[in-house]
A protein has these predicted regions:
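DG-centered beta-turn motif at the end of beta-strands
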Residues: 1, 212-217
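Short beta-strand/turn micro-motifs composed of small residues
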Residues: 78, 214, 245
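A long, amphipathic alpha-helix that forms part
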Residues: 116-119, 158-210, 261, 265-267
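Active-site-proximal alpha/beta segments of enzymes that process anionic O-linked groups
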Residues: 1-162, 238, 263, 267-293
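Proline/Glycine/Serine-rich low-complexity intrinsically disordered segments
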Residues: 18, 22, 133, 148-150, ...
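Structural motif
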Residues: 130-134, 211-213, 242
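Membrane-interface soluble catalytic domains
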Residues: 65, 196-206, 218-221, 229-232, ...
């Protein structure tokens, strides 16, 4: 949930590395302030992302298949064990690295295990590379998503804790919030490091880009007295989205950063960054395109404002 990220104004220091990178290179790093998922769980969100928001259409396209047709070597690397995701998406890649084979919430595999895989892919001599990294992120159980003993928010009475007490959130939910925020702090390390290694050692005139977004959000106490997946509240759909590229300057326009964005349209933006060109292209769904035209997704919750 972007509301728990310091980069988006949260009161706890959950994203110090990303915030520092954005402050040092604001002209290269675009933070979309109003990003939404159209789904509150992983599989439908990924189906929409890679299927351009229409995965069940008669002439449905798949982003990975299109990239391979265009000459890209595609990697799928994941710390998220899910047989459906593997069968519907990962198997389309040229190279598949699955570092976690423990399904469900009990896995204690940390996302940092993927950093070596990213560096190996970046070092590959292929001329065109499309590297997809699927993290566990801050999925429950939150206490398993960061190294043991690395929770700086544990039992800290700060403004966030005080507000939750005022909201009469239970001790269990307050503990889950502490663990969720600690998971996001570790997530910040992994995500920022993936960006850092992408930025390193680029050859002259080599085009590189990096896109980060979540498949869905989480409820961790702001809307209801509970924590976890949340298809029934806004928190389940409020996500972060960041774009970095070394060959253009999308962040130069404040207008782009303030545009509402939906993850089921992300395929159009990634396809544009990859330089894919095909008859079914819809620039009005590409948030980086001047022709972009926002349409609210049909969510099962009432949203007061998509630009809040």
């Amino acid at each position: 949930n972007r509301d728990n990220m310091q980069l988006y104004g949260y009161g706890r220091a959950t994203t110090p590395r990303l915030l520092d990178m954005q402050r040092r290179h604001p002209e290269e790093m675009l933070v979309l302030r109003h990003a939404w998922s159209a789904d509150a769980s992983t599989l439908p969100s990924l189906n929409n992302l890679f299927g351009f928001g229409e995965p069940d259409a008669a002439q449905a396209q798949h982003l990975i298949a299109m990239a391979r047709t265009a000459g890209y070597k595609v990697w799928w690397m994941s710390n998220h064990d899910d047989i459906a995701v593997e069968q519907q998406h990962a198997r389309l890649a040229n190279v598949v690295d699955m570092v976690n084979r423990t399904p469900g919430r009990a896995s204690a595999s940390l996302d940092g295990e993927l950093l070596d895989c990213i560096q190996e892919a970046l070092a590959d001599p292929a001329e065109r590379k499309f590297i997809i990294v699927h993290l566990l992120g801050a999925h429950p159980h939150y206490r398993l998503r960061f190294p043991k003993g690395e929770n700086p928010f544990d039992d800290e009475v700060d403004s966030v804790e005080t507000q939750m007490v005022t909201q009469q959130r239970s001790a269990l939910v307050r503990r889950h919030r502490q663990e969720y925020d600690a998971a996001l702090l570790y997530h910040d390390f992994v995500v920022a490091e993936s960006l850092r290694v992408t930025q390193l050692d680029a050859k002259a005139q080599e085009r590189r880009a990096w896109v980060y977004l979540s498949d869905h959000g989480q409820e961790a106490g702001p809307g209801e007295n509970r924590a976890g997946h949340s298809p029934g509240t806004e928190a389940g759909y409020r996500i972060p989205t960041i774009v970095w590229t070394n060959h253009s300057r999308p962040a130069a326009s404040t207008d782009v950063a303030q545009r509402p964005f939906r993850a089921d349209w992300a395929g159009w933006t990634v396809a544009d960054i990859l330089g894919l060109d095909w008859q079914g292209e819809m620039p009005e769904r590409n948030v980086l395109n001047p022709q972009y035209r926002w349409q609210p997704p049909n969510l099962p919750v009432q949203v007061k404002s998509f630009t809040d």
